[in-house]
């Protein structure tokens, strides 16, 4: 479910040494399965462990996850990275905003999952997003752009060179992608 690197375990172990004996960590998701989902890590004293929690045992500590957060923390990773600027804890949870879908899920669900978990995080850097409106009977994914992508002069490149290539590579049953957006250039547009 969650991978906690050795560096992160060592970091947590140092922090836990200053806490009440038996205290571990809790990994959670606030608003799981929504665009506003946020992940967090907190101390988990022994009296805060619930019967429905999942305990994940690691070499240096245990991490507790509540049952509501668990499916959204699949493939999550916690790391402690050090570079020239200092050290920081990173928590990557690709499924926090949307549950991972299985390979035999309907095509629309699988495409939507890729858009939300892989494409939109890249577009978010420009204040943009894309949504799947439908998959046509002839195999085209109809998309709608929003935020900084609406009216952006680079949207055609993003659509054809980025999104379409990635989706066609992952879903050979698709014939292509089309943009439904009525682009209105404005201050919100990235380029």
Curated annotation (Swiss-Prot):
Keyword Transport belongs to the record: no
Record carries keyword 4Fe-4S: yes
Molecular function per GO: 4 iron, 4 sulfur cluster binding; iron ion binding
Keywords assigned: 4Fe-4S, Iron, Iron-sulfur, Metal-binding
Gene Ontology biological process terms from the UniProt entry: iron-sulfur cluster assembly; protein maturation
CC cofactor note: Binds 1 [4Fe-4S] cluster per subunit. The cluster is presumably bound at the interface of two monomers.
Domain of life: Bacteria
Residues that, per the record, bind [4Fe-4S] cluster: 149, 152
Cofactors: [4Fe-4S] cluster
Gene3D superfamilies assigned: Fe-S cluster assembly (FSCA) (3.30.300.130), HesB-like domain (2.60.300.12)
InterPro entries in UniProt: Fe/S_biogenesis_protein_NfuA, FeS_biogenesis, FSCA_dom_sf, HesB-like_dom_sf, NIF_FeS_clus_asmbl_NifU_C
SUPFAM superfamilies: Fe-S cluster assembly (FSCA) domain-like, HesB-like domain
Task of the protein: Involved in iron-sulfur cluster biogenesis. Binds a 4Fe-4S cluster, can transfer this cluster to apoproteins, and thereby intervenes in the maturation of Fe/S proteins. Could also act as a scaffold/chaperone for damaged Fe/S proteins.
Recorded family membership: Belongs to the NfuA family.
Subunit structure: Homodimer.
Full protein name: Fe/S biogenesis protein NfuA
Organism: Photorhabdus laumondii subsp. laumondii (strain DSM 15139 / CIP 105565 / TT01) (Photorhabdus luminescens subsp. laumondii)
């Amino acid at each position: 479910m969650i991978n906690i690197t050795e560096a992160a375990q060592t970091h947590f172990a140092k922090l836990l040494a200053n806490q009440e004996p038996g205290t571990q960590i809790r990994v959670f998701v606030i608003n799981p399965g929504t665009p506003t989902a946020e992940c967090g890590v907190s101390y988990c004293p022994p009296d805060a462990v619930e019967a429905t929690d999942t305990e994940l045992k690691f070499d240096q500590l245990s991490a507790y996850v509540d049952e509501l957060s668990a499916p959204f923390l699949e493939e999550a990773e916690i790391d402690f990275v050090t570079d020239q600027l200092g050290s920081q804890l990173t928590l990557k949870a690709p499924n926090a905003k949307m549950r991972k879908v299985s390979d035999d899920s309907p095509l629309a669900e699988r495409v939507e999952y890729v858009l939300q978990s892989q494409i939109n995080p890249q577009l978010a850097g420009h204040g943009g997003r894309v949504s799947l409106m439908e998959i046509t009977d002839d195999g085209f994914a109809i998309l709608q752009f929003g935020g900084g992508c609406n009216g952006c002069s680079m949207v055609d490149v993003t659509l054809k060179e980025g999104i379409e290539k990635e989706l066609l590579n992952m879903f050979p049953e698709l014939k292509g992608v089309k943009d439904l957006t009525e682009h209105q250039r404005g201050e919100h547009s990235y380029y």
